[in-house]
A protein has these predicted regions:
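Residue position within the beta-strands of beta-propeller blades
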Residues: 412, 451-453, 496, 556, ...
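Immunoglobulin-superfamily
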Residues: 34-36, 50, 88-143, 153, ...
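Acidic carboxylate motifs that coordinate Ca2+ or other divalent cations, activating on Asp/Glu
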Residues: 62, 144-148, 184-186
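Repeated scaffold domains used in trafficking and secretory/extracellular systems
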Residues: 391-401, 436-447, 477-489, 528-547, ...
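Blade-level signature of beta-propeller repeat domains, shared across WD40, Kelch, NHL, RCC1
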Residues: 742-785
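Structural motif
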Residues: 417-421, 457-464, 503-511, 561-566, ...
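A short beta-strand motif characteristic of beta-propeller blades
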Residues: 427-439, 469-476, 518-537, 573-581, ...
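Short coil/turn segments that connect the beta-strands within blades of beta-propeller domains
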Residues: 406-408, 447-449, 490-494, 551-553, ...
């Protein structure tokens, strides 16, 4: 190693006599140099070493390219540096990141693949484990120069030298194989360790188990077991929508077990979807688990009881929700009516409605609707009494007096008070004037989910909330300028957003607890997020339904913040932030489906005015999954969670997406419209079971839009007069609302600037107009939900 560094002149004089250095030994890292003045030989440190790569660790903790460099450094520093027979210094000041390390391994594999494997096998190691193992076997035999079954640092240094794999390009070298994959720290790589380093895993997953389907019933627990097997299998990692679950510390998915199984303690419809498992470090071998969540049927009938005179028509309707979609059957007094069908007695809307024309006394009975699916059975009774009008039975009296109270009415709040309207006959049942303890009444721009026997309104000028129940009137003090109300049935709470002033400088959120109780009501402020109230722009609480009767969390939107603030509705306290910053999304509006637990977020336009696609947020992991394809606009979700309807006024588009019973969001189909849609309302189909239609109001034109969601069939309902102009209605971007009439409701209401229009949803036409109602832009249905 050192011979070539001593020139012949060191050993022979100019006259051919022996040099003064001929018999002088200077030691490692030094050489003899003749002093021409004295003629004596002197030992000096080597000027340089011959380039040679055989790295060695010094006792000073530094790594030297070879022994010569170590001894030369010892000489130059005047201190003893000995060779350390360990590789610790190989990794000192090592800036090799895991991503760089993976790229190095890929480079080494590709290099040896091209050099030693036949052309027909080139590249096969990328996704073929057998080909990868064959390549790594060839590499191990080559790396293991002394054929002792293991590879040490010296052998790695020779490969580095031969292949030119030093740190010229990357901070990583083959020495990092020892750093990351020498499991027992013996400074050697066994064949198994070499396999692990180069991702040759002797793990197995039978082909018939690559996809596993697990069905669970809502409310039960579920266990997903990873079928990847093998000796020394690394820990199992689980993903949902590309998000690792193991580190999230989720409340309902928090025990992964010794065998790597995924435990869901209480299954809900939000948990449905695909989960994947793989061994840590081996993402290419993964198993997909599809969790299907079944829900037993939950049934409602309408009406619960009715009295009819002979000769008229009677209808009994049934609605059931569940997963899979329930099958319906009817019984009369315990007997199947399927065998009794006739021209007089028919089943309509795919069996969800019993229609009896020209009723007779013998049609009196208890009609039981039965709903069945794979998860269970439910039933409910609708009673029909056929009686002469002269007979004042209790059933007759109850039937005839229904509607004389406050139920099954539209309540319209406007500048001249409140009008209570019965939609069937278009009758104004009552006009509550402002002088009736409601001076200068103005009301919330949108009152959502109002109590069945209770009406909530807000008086902006007096900062009060009115609660009206039959004959009683009470008021609740609120913050100034209340603009949005929402009744959360799950917790019997009313949530209230106030602006503080017209410039929205002092917005607040307040909650009224025990809202339907016979107690003294008052508002409670929610906990400010980040100790700031003045940023609140909006809030969103998912609507409860038949199979989603408990809503745990809501969202708060802050002005100009790319984040959703998650709140616990039970404690009205802040839980966490869901960041939208990666997508530069300032949330504008939100909707939600319980089928998979997805939030759909409409983003505000960017600084150039360009619209952004909606974001999809996973409600299980509280992470953004990504964009909802190229869908833009305000999202609306049908009450059963199976349709997402997005309205983009700028593009004149309504885009409809189905959401399957397994939580799969389908491709959109488009409906082009120039109506400038202001609001949407969903209504159950009168012709098909488990289907919904949607009605849309126009903010600028005099038509309304009807769409059959399953088929995309469109119809226009004309002559609804002009809406209140947007500048005249600053409380909401929806200057013409559209309100439905509950689960079994046939009618919808939408206002114009000076009138109210009632639409017949069964016939898809205008039912009537009620005039002289100026700016009746707050419409609430009170009755059967």
């Amino acid at each position: 190693e050192f011979e070539s560094l001593s020139s012949p002149s060191c050993f022979m004089g100019h006259n051919g006599h022996p040099s003064p250095c001929e018999h002088k030994y200077c030691g490692l890292g030094r050489h003899c140099v003749a002093d021409h003045e004295t003629g004596q030989g002197e030992c000096r440190c080597l000027d340089y070493c011959k380039p040679h790569y055989k790295p060695v660790c010094g006792s000073d903790g530094k790594l030297y390219q070879n022994h010569c460099e170590l001894h030369r450094a010892s000489c130059l520093r005047g201190q003893k540096i000995t060779i350390m027979h360990s590789e610790e210094c190989f990794y000192k000041d090592d800036n090799c990141r895991l991503s760089d390390y993976r790229r190095l391994k890929t480079k080494v594999l590709d290099l040896h693949d091209k050099r030693y494997m036949g052309s027909k096998f080139h590249g096969a190691h990328g996704d073929n484990m057998a080909a990868r193992k064959q390549l790594v076997d060839v590499m191990f035999r080559r790396f293991d120069a002394n054929s002792n079954g293991q590879i040490d640092a010296s052998e790695l240094s020779q490969v580095i030298k031969q292949e030119g794999l030093s740190k010229d390009v990357s901070e990583c070298t083959l020495f990092d194989l020892l750093k990351y994959n020498d499991v027992n720290d013996d400074e050697h790589l066994t064949k198994d360790e070499f396999y692990t380093a180069l991702d040759v895993y002797l793990l197995t997953l039978p082909d018939d188990q690559k996809v596993s389907v697990t069905t669970a019933t809502v409310g039960q627990s579920a266990v997903l077991t990873c079928a990847i097997a093998g000796e020394r299998r690394p820990p199992v990692l689980w993903k949902r929508n590309h998000q690792y679950l193991n580190s999230l510390n989720l409340e309902d998915i928090n025990d992964f077990g010794d065998d790597g199984s995924l435990y869901i303690t209480k299954v809900t419809t939000t948990h449905m979807g695909n989960y994947t498992c793989h061994a840590d470090g081996y993402e290419k071998l993964f198993q997909t688990h599809t969790l299907q969540v079944n829900v037993p049927p939950i049934i409602r009938v309408y009406p619960e009881s009715q009295a009819r005179e002979p000769g008229v028509t009677a209808s009994l309707r049934c609605h059931a929700e569940g997963i899979p979609g329930p099958r319906l059957a009817w019984m009369k007094n315990g007997m199947d009516i399927a065998s009794k069908l006739s021209k007089q007695l028919t089943l309509q809307a795919n069996g969800s409605e019993v229609h009896i024309s020209n009723v007779h006394f013998e049609d009196t009975g208890a009609y039981t609707c039965i709903a069945r699916n794979d998860a269970g059975v439910d039933e409910d009774i609708s009673s029909l009494f056929v009686e002469d009008s002269a007979r004042k039975t209790l059933a007759n009296i109850l039937w005839r007096e229904e509607g004389l109270g406050i139920g099954n009415m539209f309540y319209v709040f406007y500048e001249d008070g409140i009008k209570v309207i019965q939609p069937v006959a278009c009758e104004i049942q009552r006009h509550i004037k402002p002088s009736e303890k409601l001076l200068a009444l103005q009301v919330s721009s949108r009152a959502n989910g109002i109590l069945p026997r209770c009406v909530k309104a807000t008086d902006k000028s007096r900062k009060q909330l009115l609660q009206r129940s039959k004959a009683t009137v009470s008021t609740v003090d609120t913050d100034p300028y209340p603009v949005k109300l929402h009744y959360d049935k799950s917790h019997d709470q009313v949530w209230l957003l106030s602006w503080g002033d017209m410039e929205k400088n002092r917005p607040t959120l307040q909650v009224i607890n025990q809202a339907s109780g016979r107690v003294s009501h008052h508002t409670v402020h929610t906990q400010p997020i980040g100790r700031r109230f003045d940023r609140v722009d909006d809030f969103f609480i998912p609507a409860s339904g038949l199979i989603t009767n408990h809503i745990r969390f809501g969202l708060i939107l802050h002005r100009n913040e790319p984040v959703l603030h998650k709140i616990d509705l039970e404690t009205t306290s802040y839980v966490k932030n869901i960041s939208l910053r990666e997508y530069n999304c300032i949330p504008k509006s939100v909707s939600y489906t319980h089928l998979g637990g997805y939030y759909f977020v409409d983003c505000r336009p960017d600084s150039t005015g360009a619209t952004r696609p909606q974001l999809v947020v996973d409600g299980v992991t509280d992470r953004v999954i990504g964009q909802n394809r190229d869908v833009t606009g305000t999202p609306y979700v049908s009450p059963d969670g199976r349709y997402l309807v997005s309205v983009d006024d700028g593009d004149g588009l309504m885009r409809i997406q189905m959401i399957s019973e397994r939580g799969e969001i389908q491709e959109p189909f488009d409906i082009h419209t120039n109506l400038h849609l202001s609001d949407l309302a969903f209504q159950r189909s009168f012709t098909e079971v488990h289907q919904y239609n949607v009605f849309g109001s126009s903010g600028r034109q005099t038509d309304a839009l009807f769409v059959e969601l399953r088929t995309g069939k469109v119809k226009m309902i004309k002559s609804l007069k002009e809406a209140t102009k947007s500048p005249e209605w600053p409380w909401s971007s929806r200057n013409r609302p559209m309100a439905g009439s509950g689960l079994f409701g046939q009618y919808l209401m939408t206002p114009s600037r000076e009138s109210l229009f009632i639409l017949d949803g069964r016939l898809n036409k205008l039912n009537c107009e009620i005039t002289d109602v100026v700016k009746g832009n707050v419409v609430v249905w009170v009755g059967e939900s």
